[in-house]
Amino acid sequence: MVRLPPPTPPRKPNICGTSGNSNGINENIDTSTFSVSAAKALFESAKRPEVRNAAIAAAKNPFVRQTAKNVAQDEKARGAVLNAVKDPSGGNKISAAFAVADANRKSDSVPPPPPHRGGTSPGKLSGSHSAIRSQLENMHIGGSVMSSNSSTATPSYQSNSTSSYSSSAPVAPPPVPRHTQSIPSYSAPAISTPYGIAKFDYAPTQSDEMGLRIGDTVLISKKVDAEWFYGENQNQRTFGIVPSSYLDIKIPLKEAFTALPPRPAAPSGSSSGTYATAIYDYNSNEAGDLNFAVGSQIMVTARVNEEWLEGECFGRSGIFPSQFVDCPNLYQVPMKQSAPSSAPSYSHPITNNSGPKQTVTVSYDYDSGVASDLRLFEGDVITALEDIDAQWLLAECRGQQGMVPKTFLGPPYGSPKKAPSKGIAEIACAFSPKKAVATGDYHSEDPKHLYVTRGDHLLIVEDVDDYYYKGKLEAFKTLPAGILPKNIVKLEN
């Protein structure tokens, strides 16, 4: 990637205003006033290939650029250099060298200018910026930079296709009931991955950059180029790229990959090697949660319940919502062992492999778009292979195996499908519309479902089953009614 030099700083008045000789260009140049002969000598010298090549090489060297800036800003160093130019004696050259070194030492406490990324208007990506973003997305790193104020919404009942990641994340499910299940406290482990400490404050100028404050700890996951790193700010819980010159590197990337620490043992019975890919950013302030950015690879160690998983990412452990990740082999991950409960068991025994297997009729069409789930149609007959838990079944249909929700099946797992829905006229007689308010978002692309946003006023026209209502938006009564889940609806008295 070609990087342009930074803009030339404004010239201090009278820096070269003292008359004297300019050794190497024209010893008779009068610098106190404008001189045509001096200008001519300067341009003639610049035409020489060796002078031009030396100037270009010096301009490309960041150390030379920074040194020139330090000298220009330091009055003592500036005077010493001018004296050495006027009178190139050995003493003046030594004095100038010490003055330049002193100016460089003084500049150590000042943050270096961030690497140039090309001019862009706010919110618009430059060519180099787009190239960096494209590289990160191809490596599944930070396709969307996590913001510290990212919001969440009610989980969508329409599963997302794994072929394209959406930036509109679902809302995390209700927190794990911590008074009924023993969830360990996941304290931050000692850092053993590549990381650095911020030496200076840095305010991001583009959407994929990450802000820094002095002392912030940054976990480094990728070297974008010679001047930029991609990583996570553990203090601010944000992801993005930062200038490498702003970090004091404690564990470099090379050292970390040549001497990886041993991975902690997975919980007993866990399926080591089961990985999930984050399809949304997850940023939680809850202690014990595992935060990550879209595209992150997470090792799933256990299922806490039907909506929460436990895993590891970037050397950290915690729990996270299952609908924020894509995990094709999720059914292979065992449930986390919890204290014995007196609650009744909802599992249905499956006949062992030596005898005939149980068959079940599908009551509703099911197509979640998730690779590990079966695609089923009403009336299909499936073979039950394994009872995963109270809500999911591993089954086989048309030579394919996958997960199926029990609520979409007939007896003995689900309920028989109700009679076909009545017409609008019959509904008006048998079920008077009830007013309700949406307590969450339900954004489905299925034309049979109602697109609802939190706060919408609804008219419920039919109680479909134990899980769904049929209704319409009160503001659009003339439009057809659609299906929506009961758990995001609050009926008004």
Swiss-Prot record:
Q: Where is the composition biased (Polar residues)?
A: 16-28
One of the GO biological process terms = actin filament organization
**Region span, Disordered:** 1-28, 102-130, 142-187
SUPFAM superfamilies, from UniProt?
A: SH3-domain (SSF50044)
Which controlled-vocabulary keywords does the entry list?
Repeat, SH3 domain
Where in the sequence does UniProt note compositional bias of the Low complexity kind? 154-170
Record-linked PROSITE patterns: SH3 (PS50002)
Under the heading Pfam families, the entry gives:
SH3_1
Q: Which PANTHER family match?
A: PROTEIN CBG06887 (PTHR14167:SF107), SH3 DOMAIN-CONTAINING (PTHR14167)
Q: What is this protein called?
A: Uncharacterized protein B0303.7
**Organism the protein comes from:** Caenorhabditis elegans
Q: What are the leading ranks of the lineage?
A: Eukaryota, Metazoa, Ecdysozoa, Nematoda, Chromadorea
